[in-house]
Regions:
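Charged alpha-helical initiation segments
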Residues: 1-58, 78, 90
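Alpha-helix boundary/N-cap detector
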Residues: 5-17, 24, 28-31, 35, ...
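Amphipathic alpha-helical scaffolding segments
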Residues: 39, 79-87, 193-203
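Long, hydrophobic, amphipathic alpha-helical segments used as structural scaffolds
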Residues: 48, 70-82, 185, 210-213
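Structured extramembrane domains adjacent to transmembrane segments
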Residues: 51-53, 57-58, 62, 73-83, ...
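Hydrophobic alpha-helical packing segments in soluble, helical-rich domains
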Residues: 59-77, 115-129
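Flexible secondary-structure boundary motifs
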Residues: 86-165
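Charge-enriched, short contiguous segments at helix-coil
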Residues: 139-214
């Protein structure tokens, strides 16, 4: 999407905004994550400043890529290694359960957990801890992986992250609404606020996830 108002100076404002928000955490993250955030800010700038550009779907698509990139770096790589080392030659029974299938795909195909899968998965693990609900094999391995890592225990199961993920999931911006013909301004603002705290609130989803890998 071309823009007459998005120039080099405006881009540097966005770059500095992102750098100031994430600080030294950016040094530990893939450059592609940074690039996705810059592109999302470019599209957000166009959406909020130019007439005739009313569709927020491109922004949500780029933020989804940023999420996938971050989750792969913070969760997928570490969990897959842990699960494969743990399983060795063992082949746990498979169940026709969406979350269990998602974890199997992570371990066997390096798939990434979507926002729609991560939220109920963490809720299931919380229910297991608080109410003794039995977990399916791969979900149990995921729960053990969290317990094995102090940073995961502290951040991935934190109440602030849980609340933000639940709100994002309930908004369906990255689910059913994403498959509509367009996303409106208010929905984009809500997604940006939850994922990035509008680059002001340190309790955003992306920031809380980034802290896991520090």
């Amino acid at each position: 999407f071309a823009s007459n108002s998005w120039d080099q100076d405006t881009q540097w404002v966005a770059v500095n905004l992102i750098r100031e928000y994430f600080g030294s955490y950016l040094d530990t993250l893939p450059h592609q994550f940074f690039a996705y955030l810059i592109e999302a800010e470019r599209l957000y700038y166009i959406l909020t400043t130019e007439r005739g550009f009313n569709d927020g779907l491109p922004i949500i698509s780029v933020l989804t890529k940023a999420y996938d990139c971050l989750i792969h770096e913070i969760i997928t790589k570490s969990f897959v290694k842990y699960a494969r080392d743990r399983l060795r030659w063992e082949v746990p029974p498979k169940f026709n359960d969406p979350l269990e299938r998602a974890l199997i795909a992570m371990v066997t195909k390096n798939y990434t957990l979507s926002i729609g899968r991560l939220t109920p998965l963490l809720s299931r693990i919380r229910d297991h801890r608080e109410n003794g609900v039995t977990l399916l094999p791969y979900t149990q391995i995921f729960a053990d992986w969290i317990e094995w890592n102090e940073s995961l225990e502290k951040n991935l199961l934190s109440e602030p992250l849980r609340k933000k993920l639940v709100r994002l999931n309930e908004s369906e911006i990255f689910g059913e609404k994403r498959h509509r013909s367009s996303i409106n301004h208010d929905e984009v603002r809500e997604a940006r606020s939850l994922l990035l705290g509008n680059y002001e609130n340190q309790q955003s989803i992306f920031m809380l996830l980034v802290k896991i890998g520090k």
